[in-house]
């Protein structure tokens, strides 16, 4: 399977985990948030998924413990139509405490096929 990836400012090259079929995505920017604040954190990539595939954006198990943020929609779904050069993937974050999420903070993505 071939997935075309475009990296934007601040993007970290994708890391395919050695076990399983997950890809670690990272925050492409340093973000300071206050408790109760919402922000979409850029992941710095656009991808063209193969026809019939979708990606799931979910937090790592340590994201809340380390950074005090929750993914606002619990799981993001990106379908194959969100594939333009400027369709930058993001992580919708809700801060539960004052925090600074540093560039290169690992988040997580998974692709599934039809």
Regions found by a protein language model. Name each.
Residues 1-108, 114:
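DUTPase catalytic domain/fold
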């Amino acid at each position: 399977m071939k997935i075309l990836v475009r990296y934007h400012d601040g993007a970290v090259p994708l890391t395919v985990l050695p076990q399983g079929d997950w890809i670690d995505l990272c925050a492409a920017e340093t973000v300071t948030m206050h408790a109760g604040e919402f922000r979409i954190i850029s992941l710095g990539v656009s991808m063209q998924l193969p026809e019939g595939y979708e990606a799931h954006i979910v937090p790592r198990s340590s994201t809340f413990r380390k950074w005090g943020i929750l993914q606002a929609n619990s799981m993001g779904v990106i379908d194959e139509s969100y594939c333009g050069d400027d369709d930058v993937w993001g992580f919708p974050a809700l801060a539960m405490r004052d925090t600074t999420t540093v560039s290169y903070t690992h988040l997580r993505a998974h692709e599934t096929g039809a």
